[in-house]
Amino acid sequence: RLYLNDKIIVDSKQYEKLTPAEIITYSSQIGASKIALELGYDDLKSNYYDFGFTKPISINFPSSAFGYMAIKDNIVDKELASLGYGYGLTISPFQIASAYSVFANNGIFKDFKLLKDENVSSRRVISESTASNILKALEMATKDGTGKAANVNGFSQGGKTGTVHQIRSGSGYAEDMYLSLIHI
């Protein structure tokens, strides 16, 4: 358990100590929270920006609206920790697909296109080594972790599961849970 202000963050299982790869493999909200707290708000916000989460995607397609992240001057630890595992963010399916393509593209972010276009702009957002390490962690998640039900034998793959509560109008989160999987 991780106690922050009046919030308690828990994982589905108790872990002694996890590596960054294991945090991804086992979907550790405590681990993701600690990383976010260590990075700090400005670096976390910058990383979300680099991965395309806070800007529009340059396609004209339904559901391609850009994501949202509350910009705050005085963020408290529990809010920062929640951003570490994706709460407080709203992103489109195209944005999550673009972000995960960074790991398969050796750390390069490429603008999302629906049709093949050889002139797609791209930029490095993480090192090849970091992309490789995250890709290996995503592969572990589909072999041994929370995404193993999505494993398809005979294919090289990686994925990450997610469980979220949608933001309610006003304040707080809806009680309904939504499950997701991103697979590369």
Question: Model-found features: residue ranges?
Answer:
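Beta-lactam-recognizing serine transpeptidase/beta-lactamase-like catalytic domain environment
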Residues: 1-181
